[in-house]
Amino acid sequence: DDDEPSKNDDGVITNQKLLVELRVTDEDGVSITEYSYDSNGKLVSATNTEQYDGSTHTSTYTVTWGANKIIESRNGEAITYTLENGLITHTSDCDGGDLDNTDFTYNANNQLVKLQYDEEDYLSYTWQGEKLTKMAWSFSDEDIHELSYSGKTCKGYLPIMVWSVDDLCPLLEAHPELAGMRCNQLPDKIYSKDEIDETTEQYTYTFDKDGYVESCTEVSTYKRLDNNETRTETTIYTFTWE
C-alpha cells in the first residue's frame, strides 16, 4: 500500500484506501455522502443526505461504467463523462448544470489545467509541481483563488480539492484522478477576491494512523470591500477511508 498509486484500465487508483463517507458540518447543518464500490474499487453508487433547518433531503446517485464513458445519474438526471486514456475530456449534463458541455485539458503530468465551459468562458488551473497554486475565471478579472502551502501532505488525497471542478459530484470525490485532481498536497490557506468580498480560508488537518486525512477544519473570513465589515464561518469536513 506504500507504493506509488497504480491505476487500472479505467484510470482508477487501485492500491489505496477508498473514500466511504464524506461529512460536511457547519452552523446550518450537516451533509453526509456515503460511497459504495464494486469489487474492483470503482464507484457504483452514492447517497447524499442533507439535514438543514430541521428538514432532511436525500439524493441517490448511480454510476455506470462503459467503454471510455461514465454516466452518473440522479433522480432521472444524468451527467455523461467522456474519457481518453483514463482522463475525463468532456462532460455533458442533461440538466444543464455546471458541467454541461465542458471540455477538460491537462498538462504533461495529467493535471487539470483548463475547464472550457463554452466558446468564451473557462476556468484555468496553475500548478507548481504537485501543488495547485491558482485558479482563475476568464469571465472575471477579479475572481482569482490563490492557494498557499507549507509542505503538509497526506496519504491518498484531499477530496474537497475536486470541488473546484464541480461540487457534490460523487464520481469525482471518489476518483479525482479521472479529472487530474488527486491532490495529496494540503493547502494552509486559500485567498480569493471578487467584486464584493475578500475571502481567506485557513485549513487545519487531522490524520488517521495510515496518514489519510481524517478531518479538515476550514475557517473562512469574509471582508466586504466597500465597508471592511468582516464575518467568519467554520466548516468541518470529516472523511472515512476503507
List each language-model region with its residue ranges.
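Buried hydrophobic residues that stabilize the cores of well-folded domains
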Residues: D2-E242
